[in-house]
Amino acid sequence: MWFLVKATFWFSLVLVLLPFLDPSSSEKLEHGPKMEIGGTFSAANEAIQYISAICVEKPDVCEKGAETFVALGHRAREGARIAYEFLNTQFAEGDAAAPDVKVMTGTVTPAESVPSAEATEKAEPAFKRMPVPEHRLDPGPASGK
């Protein structure tokens, strides 16, 4: 879950910083809205603290949020696969334009590539959903002293 949040943050940061590298975009952005960097970071810091406080007060909200991010991650992965296949059909040369049903490198014979039912059961995880670590409270000073 945190990987998706971090990846979204860094991707957004890249999109924000790209116009600084292109001189023609600075002319377009001169007439756009202005912002203060310090105020923006302060607001982001307060938003993170607020969200952290919600997770401590109402853990069920964070649990649902984690489930939502997992579902969005699966959708994003499927979307990336669809985009890859589309780009592969548009820009690949020759016979490579047809998407492969199964990628084969030639190191495994087709008979060996079919997994047995027993091997599949051993390879599957024992849990069905991704475990999410809970927020730990600070131990604070010991009251028994």
UniProtKB/Swiss-Prot annotation:
It is found in: Membrane. It is a single-pass membrane protein. It comes from the Bacteria. Residues 119-138 have a biased composition (Basic and acidic residues). The chain crosses the membrane at residues 1-21. One of its GO terms (cellular component) is membrane. Residues 109-145 are annotated as: Disordered. Keywords: Membrane, Transmembrane, Transmembrane helix. This is Uncharacterized protein R01001.
